[in-house]
Swiss-Prot record:
Top-level division of the source organism's lineage: Bacteria
Alphabetical keyword list: Glycogen biosynthesis, Glycosyltransferase, Transferase
One Gene Ontology cellular component annotation held by this UniProt entry: cytosol
Annotated metabolic or biological route of this protein: Glycan biosynthesis; glycogen biosynthesis
Catalytic activity field: [(1->4)-alpha-D-glucosyl](n) + ADP-alpha-D-glucose = [(1->4)-alpha-D-glucosyl](n+1) + ADP + H(+)
Species whose genome carries this gene: Anaeromyxobacter dehalogenans (strain 2CP-C)
One Gene Ontology term from the biological process aspect of the record: glycogen biosynthetic process
Name recorded for this polypeptide: Glycogen synthase
Binding site for ADP-alpha-D-glucose: K15
Amino acid sequence: MQILFVASEVAPWSKTGGLGDVAGALPRALAERGNEVVVVTPRHGSIDPRAAGLQPVRTSLHVRGEPVALWVKRGPAPVYFVEHPHLFGSRRGLYGDGGRDHPDNAERFAFLTRAALALPGALGLRPRILHLNDWQCGLGPWLLRHEHARDPALAGARTVFTIHNLAYQGLFPKQVLPALGLPWEVFRWEAMEFFDQLSFMKAGLAFADALTTVSPTYAREILTPEGGASLDALLRHRARDLHGILNGIDVHAWDPARDPHLPAHFTPGELAGKAACKAALQREVGLPVRRDAPLAGLVTRLAEQKGIDLVAAALPALLARDVQVVLLGSGDPAYEEAFARAAREHPDRVAARIGFDEGLAHRIEAGADLFLMPSRFEPCGLNQMYSLRYGTVPVVRSVGGLADTVEDFDGFARGTGFRFAEYTPQALLTATRRALDVFRDRRAWRGLVERGMAEDNSWERSAARYEALYRTLAP
């Protein structure tokens, strides 16, 4: 099956979050199953074509009469990079700079989507599925119906629109419609109008043939007023077309048996390397090397969506239980300063690294005993799956993909982590204390670790579910 996969970011070339990871891994997994997958994404200003090994493409691609240059990264699922010197090439930030969105994001991502839809005709492709991701590609289903209805390259193509995070909706003033080349008739409540603004997210939800999101629990949550970000009525109307398909992880990049970022390697049957990773991590971040001290890790955005307010409130009680904490992340300046201050005040208990370091993220996953993810909401989440694979026991809130991937320990021989429901510091503390009690029981703890490491969270499983959905749309 030929699939056109469109995303505003694709790891490792561009990434701000889970969307980039999905767009970098799912197309490859689909290609490994025998599908012909082509990925389309912008050539952001942060991407150096020469350093990335991109090749220029000779093509007659045009968007609204304007010629468009293309680059390609060859591979099992080739990635085509759409060039536009002003809209993309001159920008370092993918969506904004200095904490502010680019003011022309509507024009930028309408251009990307139009370029993606024009690409099959320019390259001689005949995709049966157009897989469009998040608000940035939300205009795609409408554009397919109204601007490509007679395009032979897209004849019979069906659309899948994936919601990675419903909270980000691509909202713009209605006055941008003429600049986008859209008729005023789309600005209706049953189309793209959303509280007197134009919503790219709503466009995708209203016009795509099938909707997916990144975990079964999140698919249920967004049907409710509490989780639906004011789009729950539309989503309930389309509930039969909505599918929750759990994300996977790259089990080659995240493999404790051969991860190049680690000082030692380990497997479920031989865990000595994990103890070595813990000691090395403690030395690296300046904590006392203590095998007996539970080491809790966090790799996170410092934002309330991630529950960082709960961690900050619970931190004094955690430290009173002789817990060491290592945090890697950036975000809200107030939380950056709060954790930097905690590290200064408790240098033997807290280590805070503000920013991001890919290697250190791997070493935290390998060296920590516990991993804290108390998210307010979490469409899928990846770090809890990395933790399971690395024998690090997750403590998570029972929302979204966290509820789908972490089974609560039953006190005997079932479970892979510890879950809690209420969004309060006390609930986080209670779950963490349960984990600490089991940590003292080496036999029970090893069982938790081994069960987590045995979980299959590969992209192969997720790709099979997407492929099955595609075939129901385009038999």
